[in-house]
């Protein structure tokens, strides 16, 4: 498994992810956001959707062109626009009001790899590159307790703030993980407990009553 920064905004390359395997796949087509990925060249890890032949989804531009998934290739081709070597993807751009803060916009893990820690490892892997680009702070807004926990594992901590759409705002210094406390970690989970989730979120939150912040996940070495 390798970590790669594909590019920085505002002229980053597009990345086409299979919308059947990745949440927010359409967000990674935009060139206005930076992108970083965890990918594999191991043929046993290359994954295509069970729907072997599929049309392009509504987020794609060439709606009239027939697209087919080829299980023998892991890079985009004329017949298959998706990069099947990607295990997890992260999009990012500078904060709109503070150009020293880098905002993580979307973190998406391939469906068969969710829960394996790839999200926080990817988020942590970008941090030294953000420092090299002059950023001193990282920020992300999360809309569910699973993402909250994952970003804690990447060194983020809840700020006590929410966005206008009830996402919890987490931050960390770019160079080192955030300093956090049991009370700070639990207070963010309490905000989610107020929202009366069903399973699996309710069980997840119940299992984290009176627990300390999770251990950090390690970054992945960069190929660049």
Question: In which residue ranges do the predicted regions lie?
Answer:
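Minor-groove-contacting beta-hairpin "wing" of winged helix-turn-helix DNA-binding domains
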Residues: 166-170
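Conserved active-site alpha-helix within GNAT-family acetyltransferase domains
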Residues: 142-165
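Segments forming oxygen-rich coordination pockets for charged ligands
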Residues: 93
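Haloarchaeal acidic low-complexity proteome signature biased toward cell-envelope/secretome components but also
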Residues: 1-86, 96-104, 131, 158-161, ...
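Short, well-structured hydrophobic secondary-structure segments
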Residues: 86-88, 119
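Conserved GNAT-family N-acetyltransferase fold
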Residues: 88-90, 107
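Conserved acetyl-CoA-binding loop-helix of GNAT-fold acetyltransferases
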Residues: 109, 115-128, 153
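Conserved GNAT acetyl-CoA-binding A-motif
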Residues: 130-143
